[in-house]
Swiss-Prot record:
Listed EC numbers: 3.1.26.4
Example GO BP: DNA replication, removal of RNA primer
NCBIfam families in the record: PRK00203.1
UniProt lineage: Bacteria, Pseudomonadati, Pseudomonadota, Gammaproteobacteria, Pasteurellales
InterPro entries: RNase_H, RNaseH-like_sf, RNaseH_domain, RNaseH_sf, RNaseHI
Organism: Actinobacillus pleuropneumoniae serotype 5b (strain L20)
Record protein name field: Ribonuclease H
Gene name of this polypeptide: rnhA
TM region positions: none
Superkingdom per UniProt: Bacteria
GO MF term (any one): nucleic acid binding
Length: 153
């Protein structure tokens, strides 16, 4: 299996508001950077979407070192999702899981890969996280895409 390093970040100008994702993907000494902007969304949706988009870029199953400053995303996919699926996508207190369709998409993307999840402290000088932050902000400042599934309720 190829070893791929992925760094992601999501940004939102206002919450909700215009949002963006930033991705740095590194394989075999090569680095690819991605920035996309969304017209109306939330910060958590952007954190999730960044990881989904990054994993979708991989053409074959890989060993992935995935780095994100989103504790929400990391805890959701490594801890909470198992209970959510058992409880028909309800939280521990019986409420519907927010961003359900993105969690389902992320759960589908991770099935192909062997992933090591790492939380990175945001805004702390971590090179790739800072790059992702800039890419996400650039996307949020120039949004062109609709965040399908976003519901303001």
């Amino acid at each position: 299996m190829k070893l791929v390093e992925i760094f992601t970040d999501g940004s939102c100008l206002g919450n909700p508001g215009k949002g963006g994702i930033g991705i740095v993907l590194r394989y075999n000494g090569h680095e690819k950077q991605v920035s996309k902007g969304y017209l109306q969304t939330t910060n958590n949706r952007m954190e999730l979407r960044a990881v989904i988009e990054a994993l979708a870029m991989l053409k074959e199953p890989c060993q992935v070192q995935l780095n994100s400053d989103s504790q929400y995303m990391k805890d959701g996919i490594t801890k909470w999702i198992f209970s959510w699926k058992k409880n028909n996508w309800k939280t521990a207190n019986g409420k519907p899981v927010k961003n359900k369709e993105l969690w389902i998409a992320l759960d589908q993307e991770i099935q192909r890969h062997k992933i090591e999840w790492t939380w990175v402290k945001g805004h702390s000088g971590h090179r790739e996280n800072e790059i992702c932050d800039e890419l996400a902000k650039a996307g949020a400042n120039n949004p062109t895409l609709e965040d399908i599934g976003y519901n303001a309720d």
